[in-house]
Amino acid sequence: MTDRTLKKVTKRKNGVIPMEQNVLTNMYETLGISKKVLDFAAEIEEHLKTRFQEIDERAEFNQLKVIHAMQECRVSDIHFAATTGYGYNDLGRDTLEEVYAHVFHTESALVRPQLMSGTHALHVALSGNLRPGDELLSPVGKPYDTLEEVIGIRDSVGSLKEYGISYRQVDLLPDGTFDYENIAKAVNEKTKLVTIQRSKGYDPRPTFSVKQIGELIAFIKKIKPEVICMVDNCYGEFVETIEPTDVGADMIVGSLIKNPGDS
C-alpha cells in the first residue's frame, strides 16, 4: 500500500486530510489504535528521550571501540576462512582473541568454541588459577546456581572442593551494598582469588556498576595486593563505556550468547 493509497483511505473515512499527514499515524489508525493511545505513547517517549539518547550514544561508542580494535588488529577477509579446529596457525581464532584483548584492555584472551558456556569459562578460569590449599572468596554473596557444583557448595565430581580448594563468602548488607567490615575479616593468607559476580543473577539485589566494582577491588587489593580479582561480567559487557578490567580487575569472564553475541 503506497502513501497515496493511505491518504485516499483516510480521506474517504474522515474527510479532507492535509497532504503532510504522517503516514505512520494513518497506519496505526488503520489498525484500530486510537490517537489517544498514540499521544500517550508520544508523551512517554518524549519523557524518556534523554535516557534513550544516552543508551544510543553508549552503544555507538562501544561499537566504534570494537571497530577500532578490529582495525588495530588488521582484521580482513582472510580471518573468516573455515577452521578445522586444529590448534596451530588458526589465524582467525588468534586474531579474534587479539581483538577481544584490545577491546577489554587485557594482556590476552581466550575466545574459542572449546568453551561451551559462561559456566564452563568460569570453571576454566577458577581451576586454572587455584591450587590445593588455596581459598576462593566471594564478597558479593552466593554465586549463580550453576557454579555451586563447580565450587563444591553442592557435591560434584571434579569440584574445586574435591581438589582441596576451600570457599568462603561474605553476604551483602540488607541494602545490597558491600559489607566491607566482614570482607576485610574474610581475606586471609589462603585467599588466592576473589570472584565478583556483576549481575544480580537470580537474587533480588542490585547489579553492580563498574565504579562500584572498582571500589571493591581497590579495597581488597589494599588488604592483599597479590590476590587475583576476577569479575563474572556476564550481561555486563558494553553496558558502560568502561569495563571491570579498566578499574583493576585482573580477569573478566563472560558468555558469548549474551551481550558480545548480540542475542
Predicted regions and their residues:
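Compositionally biased, low-complexity repeat tracts
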Residues: 8-11, 28, 81
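Active-site-flanking structural segment that lines cofactor/substrate pockets
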Residues: 80-110
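Conserved PLP-enzyme active-site core in the AAT-like
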Residues: 20-42, 49, 56, 66-67, ...
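N-terminal low-complexity/disordered regulatory or targeting extensions
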Residues: 59-60
